[in-house]
Each structure stands twice: as C-alpha cells, then as structure tokens.
C-alpha cells in the first residue's frame, strides 16, 4: 500500500515539475543606430517580460526606422537583463552630458555634429508626438562647468 501512495506522489510530483514554467526575466530592449549624417543614437524602451516580447519591441522600432532611413546602420540591438553606462542612465532618467529624447516608455540619447544635434533632437521629439504619443521632449545636456 505504501508503494502505491509513493507511486501516486511521484506521479503528481512529475506532473507538477513538467507543467511548471519559471517566470520569464524582465528585459530592456536596446538598439544602437548610426545615421549617414553622423548621428549615433542609443534607444532604450521600458522593460518587458520575456525574450519574445523584447525582440518584438526591437522589431517594432527597427522596421519603421529602416524604411524611413535605409542608409542608417543598426550598430547593435540587445535584450539586456542588467543595464550599465549610458543605457542605465537613460532607463533611470538620470542626467546625461548628451541630448536625450524622452517620451512614454522611450528614451534616446543622441550624439552627433554639435551644430546639428539640437535640431535633430527637437525634430525627433516633435515627430514622436505627430506619430501619436501624447508627449515627447528633447532634454538638453547641462552646460559645461
């Protein structure tokens, strides 16, 4: 009788183990892009759960970008579980020494030709609003000390 109980317990444990799926990690979609005009943009979205959702967020950003700017080069894209450097500062909305476009769930840092980077930042922020998001702003870097 105790072997029957043990067998039933092992069967139930086996069912539990095979149906249990661990929670997918929270990942941050990151894309780095370079334009032919000399702008380098780091794009960070809000964290999403799971690799599939993260890859979809990257695709949603990259496909329209490649259509709008076929000469732009996607330097890299990643789904990061931990952020460092520029990406961490963007995700946490910390001050940066570069121009930043901030909108709902999106942050972009932009580095480029000094005489044109401010106009680019303001233009992108305005375009984001025209595309349907409620607000977007260009955050200027702090003045040199």
Task: Name the predicted role of every residue range.
Residues 1-12:
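N-terminal Sec-pathway targeting helices
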Residues 14-145:
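Mitochondrial intermembrane space
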């Amino acid at each position: 009788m105790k072997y029957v109980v043990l067998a039933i317990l092992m069967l139930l444990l086996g069912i539990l183990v095979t149906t249990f799926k661990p929670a997918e990690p929270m990942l941050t979609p990151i894309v780095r892009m370079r334009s032919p005009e000399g702008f380098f943009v780091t794009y960070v979205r809000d964290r999403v759960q799971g690799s599939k959702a993260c890859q979809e967020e990257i695709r949603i950003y990259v496909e329209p970008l490649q259509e709008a700017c076929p000469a732009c080069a996607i330097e890299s894209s990643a789904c990061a579980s931990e952020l460092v450097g520029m990406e961490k500062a963007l995700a946490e909305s910390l001050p940066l020494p570069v121009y930043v476009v901030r909108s709902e769930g999106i942050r972009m840092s932009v580095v480029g030709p000094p005489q044109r980077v401010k106009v680019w930042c303001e233009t992108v922020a305005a375009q984001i609003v025209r595309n349907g998001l409620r607000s977007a702003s260009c955050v200027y870097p702090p003045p040199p000390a």
